[in-house]
Structures are given as C-alpha cells and as structure tokens.
C-alpha cells in the first residue's frame, strides 16, 4: 500500500512523495550540514539530498527506509 511521506524543515514541507514504507527521524542541523534521504517508491528507489542552511533549524524526515545495501547489490549486478 502506498502512503504519503514528507520531509520537513522547521515544520515546512520541503519535499513529499509516495513511498511504500515509513521511517521517522530528526536531524539536528547544528551537528550535520547535509544528509541524503533514501526512500522507496512503489516502482523503485530514489534519494533526496537536503542541505541544512540554518544552524538552528531542526530537520525531521519521514521517508522510506535506507536501501543502500539493495542499491549497491543492484549496481553490482549491472
């Protein structure tokens, strides 16, 4: 079943999409300057790079699970 998932910065939606699974987490921009969000579409995988622009902002992400191992395995098969 597909669900809506969003990435928020200071409670504003900066990206939304449909994904199969949900993972919830918060990222403190005072400790990281950027991070990559991996998510799983109904039809495949993708990622979204989010740069933290303000040292005081809290970034929360609700997105698909990390699929690094799956993507790495798929690349190795090519």
UniProtKB/Swiss-Prot annotation:
This is Host range factor 1 homolog. It comes from Orgyia pseudotsugata multicapsid polyhedrosis virus.
């Amino acid at each position: 079943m597909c669900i809506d998932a969003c990435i928020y910065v200071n409670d504003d939606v900066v990206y939304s999409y449909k994904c199969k699974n949900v993972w919830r987490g918060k990222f403190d921009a005072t400790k990281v300057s950027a991070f990559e969000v991996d998510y799983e579409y109904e039809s495949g995988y993708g990622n979204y790079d989010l740069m933290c622009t303000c040292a005081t902002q809290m970034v929360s992400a609700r997105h698909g699970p990390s699929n690094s191992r799956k993507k790495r395995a798929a690349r190795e098969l090519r």
